Amino acid sequence: LAIELKDFTIDEYPPKLMLIDNETGRTLPEKAPEHLLLEEGVTEGQLSDWLVTIRQTIPWAASVATEDTVKFTEFHSMGATYAVYLQAINQKTKTAKESWVSCGSFIFPYKALRLDSLTSLIMPEREPQRFASTVKVYTEDGKQVEDTIAVNHPLNVAGWNIYQLSYDDTKGRWSDISVFELVRDPWLPAVY
C-alpha cells in the first residue's frame, strides 16, 4: 500500500484564558485551575480576582512588533493564530491592565499579559476536537481509493484498516503530516 495525503483538517475547541504563576508556570488556582472558555459571544468572565473583558477578537491573526509593544492584525494565511485584546481588572485592588493575548503558532510567538509580579494571563494552545485526513490509497493490484480517515473512523482497503493516529502537533491546524496505523488481521473474519 501507498498513501498520499491530499488534505488535513482539524476542528479545535474554542481557545481559553487561564492564570499562571509567574515563577513556576503552573496554572492557578493550583489545585483546581480556572479557565475562561472563549466561545462565540463570550465578552467577559471572572478568573480568580480578575474581571476579564474581551475588547477585540481576531481568529486569524498575525503579531506585528511596533516600537514598544506587540499588536495583532488580520492574517488569513498559513501560521495564523488566535488573538484577543482584553482588559483585566482586579476586583480587590482595582488594578487594571490591558493588552493583546494569544496562544501563538509555529510562526508567531505566544503573547501573555503580566497582571502583577505573581500572576500572568495566558491563552494555552488550542486543543484538537477532531482531526481527519483526506487520502488517496494505492494498492498493489493497481486500485486507487480516495477517502477520509478520522480518529476512530478507519479506512478499510485491501484487507488493511488504516487508522488516523496523529499529526504534526507543532504546526497544529497547519500540519502537512499525518501519522497512520495500518492493521491487518487475516484471521479476524474466520473467528467470527
Predicted regions, residues:
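Solvent-exposed, non-transmembrane regions of integral membrane proteins
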Residues: 1-192
